[in-house]
């Protein structure tokens, strides 16, 4: 017998696919209908050794359908999502439900753009506002409301937003919080073309964002009294700010091959659960400088964030739920399997760090460069928590709650190293064009306690090799080998993956991640994976079978936990 959950999942997926076919065959007058469909499902098999727990419904899946109608300057769209029986990692973060949770209507001309419904938006680098979607992470914090964009003169851009932030599949009705804001940017190269013609870049911008959340309860906390012991402290509801504003100013300047970006943001007092309900204002600074010329490039970045976690609701602390802003991660992002679980997660309440990357190409037709040159990339990044000195009232009470919390020297690094990465990558294409080899080395230091809640530090050496061979113009073979040596956490691992592709339609791969150095002999496990994919026009169908170890998934410094799993997966994506 097929379970009710499987029947519903199959029915929903079939209806969504049918909708794709139906809409893909029609055009209404001068308008055009387009969209895309995605399904990601899995049949789960329990495995006690890797920690893959039995689940009530073994067949699970995530499905969505986007429909967009456009006609001249007008467009309207909606997205239906079916996550009633989602993949277990989505269920664990509360991303479960179904319905049309994204819909909008938009009109745009050269002067104005107006949107009603759901929309995504970002001001500057996102220090004050970033409403975005990342389906892989289960993040969708779109705003439901209205947005206006104005371009009164070329190079002058003004935006204003008002809306309620999406909270997974929870209803909007009854919410007592909303977000509003405005942003202005002036691009002097567009306003005065002579600036751009001379090779200069000059842009400045500023914004303000404010959240409102009704304060309806007192906040209780413990105070340590020398004579009375532990007593209860109270923050009256009328002392809890209902309106919390942030503002930011940014600038970009450049000349030919040099560019400098800077943005500073400040948040008013925002007592909430993630900062232990302190009244200290927050602030963040982002700096980036780049220089590039033929065969050489250098990029340096700096970030400092102090008490800058900014959410629609003060009691929310789950993953990235109801986050209004996003502090960008400036460290280099990697796709290596073995250090994926040690990716750095940006810390909006306490981080200071820097990143340096140098790219150099050994000249073509030289002894070391060969016919096509050899690319070398060096990378170094280091992040600490910030310096914190408790204010006298916090010391006296034995808690920062209800006080200004702490003071902090702006450019002083805190005592705790969060993350450090030293990396070197060499890429070379051989003279016959058929062979390409990438060799990489990284030394990672990762604070398990602060970043993942596990005890200790992880210090590890990673060596990775990626060798590609073009068998024929359409057939290619790729071998990826990795070795992570560490005495910390789960110990050393090796990874091997062989991929064969027949362009442009077929892809096959087999891989194995062996945690041979695990201190527990039972968990010296092989995490194997076999997959194949077929691509036809805009449609991709993929099958995979294997094991996934428990860890984290990170995209751009935003992370979520990934539970261990074992089973057969199916993925379908298409657009029309």
What role is predicted for each listed range?
Residues 26-53, 383:
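Short glycine/proline- and aromatic-enriched beta-strand/turn motifs that initiate or cap beta-hairpins
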Residues 1-34, 575-576:
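Bacterial Sec-dependent N-terminal signal peptides
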Residues 68-70, 74-165, 194-196, 294-315:
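Outer membrane beta-barrel
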Residues 139-238, 242-247, 252:
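Hydrophobic, small-residue-rich alpha-helical packing segments that form membrane-like cores
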Residues 55-70, 77:
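Long, low-hydrophobicity, solvent-exposed regions enriched in small/turn-prone and acidic residues
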């Amino acid at each position: 017998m097929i379970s009710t959950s499987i029947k519903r999942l199959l029915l929903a997926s079939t209806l969504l696919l049918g909708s794709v076919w139906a809409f893909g065959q029609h055009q209404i007058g001068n308008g055009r209908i387009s969209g895309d469909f995605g399904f990601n499902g899995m049949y789960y098999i329990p495995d006690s050794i890797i920690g893959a727990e039995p689940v009530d419904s073994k067949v699970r899946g995530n499905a969505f359908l986007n429909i967009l109608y456009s006609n001249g300057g007008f467009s309207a769209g909606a997205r239906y999502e079916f996550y009633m029986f989602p993949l277990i990692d989505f269920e664990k973060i509360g991303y479960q439900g179904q319905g049309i949770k994204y819909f909008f209507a938009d009109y745009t001309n050269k002067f104005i753009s107006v949107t009603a419904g759901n929309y995504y938006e970002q001001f500057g680098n996102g220090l004050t506002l970033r409403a975005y979607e990342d389906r892989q992470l289960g993040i969708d914090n779109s705003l439901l409301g209205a947005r206006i964009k104005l371009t009164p003169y070329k190079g002058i851009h003004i935006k204003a937003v008002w809306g309620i932030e999406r909270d997974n599949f929870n209803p909007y009705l009854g919410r007592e919080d909303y977000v509003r804001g405005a942003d202005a940017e002036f691009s002097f190269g567009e306003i005065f073309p002579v600036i751009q013609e001379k090779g200069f870049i000059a842009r400045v911008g500023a914004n303000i964002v404010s959240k409102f959340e009704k304060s309806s309860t007192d906040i209780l906390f413990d105070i340590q009294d020398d004579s009375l012991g532990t007593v209860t402290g109270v923050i009256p509801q009328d002392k809890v700010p209902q309106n919390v504003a942030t503002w930011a100013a940014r600038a970009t300047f450049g000349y030919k091959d040099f560019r400098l970006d800077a943005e500073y943001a400040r948040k008013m007092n925002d007592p909430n659960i993630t900062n232990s309900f302190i009244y200290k204002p927050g602030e963040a600074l982002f700096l980036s400088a780049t220089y590039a010329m033929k065969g050489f490039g250098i990029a340096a970045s700096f970030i400092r964030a102090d008490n800058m976690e900014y959410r629609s609701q003060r009691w929310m602390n789950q993953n990235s739920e109801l986050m209004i802003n996003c502090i960008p991660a400036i460290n280099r992002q990697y796709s290596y399997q073995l250090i994926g679980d040690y990716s750095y997660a940006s810390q909006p309440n306490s981080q200071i760090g820097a990143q340096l990357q140098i790219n150099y190409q050994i000249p073509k037709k030289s002894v070391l460069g060969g016919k096509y040159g050899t690319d070398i990339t060096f990378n170094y990044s280091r992040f600490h928590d910030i310096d914190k000195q408790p204010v006298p009232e916090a010391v006296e009470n034995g808690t920062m709650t209800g006080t200004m919390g702490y003071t902090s020297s702006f450019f002083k690094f805190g005592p705790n190293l969060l993350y450090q990465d030293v990396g070197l990558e060499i890429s070379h294409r051989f003279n016959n064009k058929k062979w390409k080899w990438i060799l990489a080395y990284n030394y990672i230091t990762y604070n398990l306690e602060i970043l993942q809640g596990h005890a200790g530090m992880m210090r590890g050496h990673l060596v990775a090799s990626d060798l590609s061979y073009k068998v024929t113009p359409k057939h290619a073979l790729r071998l990826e080998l990795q070795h992570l040596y560490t005495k910390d956490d789960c110990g050393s691992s090796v990874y091997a993956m062989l991929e064969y592709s027949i362009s442009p339609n077929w892809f096959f791969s087999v891989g194995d991640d062996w945690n041979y150095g695990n201190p527990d002999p039972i968990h010296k496990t092989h995490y194997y994976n076999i997959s194949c994919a077929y691509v036809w026009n805009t449609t991709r169908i993929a099958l995979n079978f294997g094991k996934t170890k428990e860890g984290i998934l990170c995209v751009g410094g935003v992370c979520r936990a990934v539970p261990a799993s074992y089973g057969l997966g199916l993925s379908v994506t298409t657009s029309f």
